[in-house]
Amino acid sequence: MAEVPADSRGATYLGFDFGERNIGVAVGQSVTGTAAPLRTLRAQPSARLWAAISELIDQWLPAGLVVGLSHQQDGSENPITAPTLRFCRQLEGRYRLPVYTVDETLTTAESRTHFYQRRRRKSVEFEQVKDEMAAQLILQTWFSIDKASPR
């Protein structure tokens, strides 16, 4: 969708793990290549979702937005791919910020592993934070790859 500008080193980015029920959000800094989970938003009602995203954008003033794009393990699209791309277009249209995508295959499974290794908590607690933890991994993955190519 967009190329990363050369002067964006040290910039703040918001990452999104899109789902039809919940959307995980993380914040990260490109200078360190690290991200932290922020919160999980309910996807419905739509007006409340966009108000919450607007609030986060006003608070963090990101240079861009990164959305995880899910595919099957063989690279083909899955049922969530089209709604995710629609969400990307909506973000771009509403906020006039560059929107980048990165492969998010297995990020929720990876976040589960990180959660249990570090916190040794109950599965109920994981369910509350899994989407924002997946958003954190999406953003960290994006920081670690060659970002010169557009979405």
UniProtKB/Swiss-Prot annotation:
Main location: cytoplasm
GO process terms (BP): rRNA 5'-end processing
EC number(s) given by UniProt: 3.1.-.-
MF term (GO), any: nuclease activity
Enzyme class, spelled out: hydrolase
Localisation per UniProt entry: Cytoplasm
GO cellular component, as recorded: cytosol
Keywords: Cytoplasm, Hydrolase, Nuclease, Ribosome biogenesis
One Pfam family here: RuvX
InterPro entries registered for this protein in UniProt: RNaseH-like_sf (IPR012337), YqgF (IPR005227), YqgF/RNaseH-like_dom (IPR006641), YqgF/RNaseH-like_dom_sf (IPR037027)
Described function: Could be a nuclease involved in processing of the 5'-end of pre-16S rRNA.
Assigned protein family: Belongs to the YqgF nuclease family.
Protein name: Putative pre-16S rRNA nuclease
